[in-house]
C-alpha cells in the first residue's frame, strides 16, 4: 500500500531573515485532517515556519509542496483558495469596517467581474456569528480592542473557507473565555468538517487539550512530533523550555497537563 503524502509539506527547508538563519534542513508535514499545534520557545522558528508554508516567505533553500505541486507554481489567488492564513500582528488595510474586513476573505473565490454573491454573504455572516462579532459589523476596525480585532481577523480567515488553515498565535489578545471559544471552534472545524489546521500556540495545556497532533521545535529543529499523549513528557518539556515540571492527566479531558516546578539550571537546559 502506498503511503499517503500530506497536502502541505516542506522539504529540507532553510529559513531565515537575511544572514540570520532560523532553521536549516527542516523537513515537516502538516498531517491531513488533524489539528496540529506547533509549540516551542520564543525564537525557535514557529512563526517563520508557518509563514513559509503559507508562501508569505520564500525559503533560502528547499521547497514547500501543496497538493503535490511546488507552491511557487500556483497563482496567489489559487493558494488563497487552498490555504487560509492568520498572520501575527496583521495590519488593517485602511479605515474599513469589521464586515468589510471579513468580506476580504471571499476575494479568492470571486471570479473576475463577478458581483457579490449569495454564498459570499452567507460565508461572511457565518464567520462573524462563529466569532461573536456580528454586533460589531459596522464598526471601524481601528476602534476595536486588541481582542475584538483579533476575532475580526479570525472571522476573515473563516470566511475564506479553505480546507487548510494556518494560524499564528490565534489566541493572542483574547481573554480566557474567548481563547476557549476559539479553540473549541477550531476543534469543531477539524472534527466535524475535516479541516486541516496548524496553529502556533504558547499555552501547552491548551495545545494538549485541543490539538490532535503536536510539532515541538527547538532552535529550528523538530524535537518531537505526534499525538500529545504520546510525546508530552517531563523530559521533553525540560529539553525544549528548560523547565522542570510534572505531567499529570487533565481531570476534564484526560490529556497531558503540564504543572511547572521551576527553571532548570542553564547548563542542563542548553544540553
UniProtKB/Swiss-Prot annotation:
Cellular compartments per GO CC: ATP-binding cassette (ABC) transporter complex, substrate-binding subunit-containing; membrane; plasma membrane
Instruction: Report the catalytic activity.
Output: Fe(III)-enterobactin(out) + ATP + H2O = Fe(III)-enterobactin(in) + ADP + phosphate + H(+)
Q: Where is it located?
A: Cell inner membrane
Where is the ABC transporter domain positioned along the sequence?
Answer: 8-244
Keyword field: ATP-binding, Cell inner membrane, Cell membrane, Ion transport, Iron, Iron transport, Membrane, Nucleotide-binding, Translocase, Transport
Q: What are its E.C. numbers? A: 7.2.2.17
Positions annotated to bind ATP: 40-47
Question: What is the topology of this protein in the membrane according to its UniProt annotation?
Answer: Peripheral membrane protein
Top enzyme class, one word, equals translocase
Per its UniProt record, what PROSITE patterns does this chain match?
ABC_TRANSPORTER_1, ABC_TRANSPORTER_2
List, in alphabetical order, the Gene Ontology terms for molecular function in this entry: ATP binding; ATP hydrolysis activity; ferric-enterobactin transmembrane transporter activity
- InterPro entries attached here? AAA+_ATPase, ABC_transporter-like_ATP-bd, ABC_transporter-like_CS, P-loop_NTPase, Siderophore_ABC-ATPase
* GO BP: any one term: ferric-enterobactin import into cell
Do you know what upregulates this one? Controlled in part by the amount of available iron. Induced 1.5-fold by hydroxyurea.
Q: What does this protein do?
A: Part of the ABC transporter complex FepBDGC involved in ferric enterobactin uptake. Responsible for energy coupling to the transport system.
Please give the family membership noted in the entry: Belongs to the ABC transporter superfamily.
Quaternary data: The complex is composed of two ATP-binding proteins (FepC), two transmembrane proteins (FepD and FepG) and a solute-binding protein (FepB).
Q: Which NCBIfam families match?
A: PRK10253.1
Q: What is this protein called?
A: Ferric enterobactin transport ATP-binding protein FepC
Q: Which organism is it from?
A: Escherichia coli (strain K12)
Amino acid at each position: 500500500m502506498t503511503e499517503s503524502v500530506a497536502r502541505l509539506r516542506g522539504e529540507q527547508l532553510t529559513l531565515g531573515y537575511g544572514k540570520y538563519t532560523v532553521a536549516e534542513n527542516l523537513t515537516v508535514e502538516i498531517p491531513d485532517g488533524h489539528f496540529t499545534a506547533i509549540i516551542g520557545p520564543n525564537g525557535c522558528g514557529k512563526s517563520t515556519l508557518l509563514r513559509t508554508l503559507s508562501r508569505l516567505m520564500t525559503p533560502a533553500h528547499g521547497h514547500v509542496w501543496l497538493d503535490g505541486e511546488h507552491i511557487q507554481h500556483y497563482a496567489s489567488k489559487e493558494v488563497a483558495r487552498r490555504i487560509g492564513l492568520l498572520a501575527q500582528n496583521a495590519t488593517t488595510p485602511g479605515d474599513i469596517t469589521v464586515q468589510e474586513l471579513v468580506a476580504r476573505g471571499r476575494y479568492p473565490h470571486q471570479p473576475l467581474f463577478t458581483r457579490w454573491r449569495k454564498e459570499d454573504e452567507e460565508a461572511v455572516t457565518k464567520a462573524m456569528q462563529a466569532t461573536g462579532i456580528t454586533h460589531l459589523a459596522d464598526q471601524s476596525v481601528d476602534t476595536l480592542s486588541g481582542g475584538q480585532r483579533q476575532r475580526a481577523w479570525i472571522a476573515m480567515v473563516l470566511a475564506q473557507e479553505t480546507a487548510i488553515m494556518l494560524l499564528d498565535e490565534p489566541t493572542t489578545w483574547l481573554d480566557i473565555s474567548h481563547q476557549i471559544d476559539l479553540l473549541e471552534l477550531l476543534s469543531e472545524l477539524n472534527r466535524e468538517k475535516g479541516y486541516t489546521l496548524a496553529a502556533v500556540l504558547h499555552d501547552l495545556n491548551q495545545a494538549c487539550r485541543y490539538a490532535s497532533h503536536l510539532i515541538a521545535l527547538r532552535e529550528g529543529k523538530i524535537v518531537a512530533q505526534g499525538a500529545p499523549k504520546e510525546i508530552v513528557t517531563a523530559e521533553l518539556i525540560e529539553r525544549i523550555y528548560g523547565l522542570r515540571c510534572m505531567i499529570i492527566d487533565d481531570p476534564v479531558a484526560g490529556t497531558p497537563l503540564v504543572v511547572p516546578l521551576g527553571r532548570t539550571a542553564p547548563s542542563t537546559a542548553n544540553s
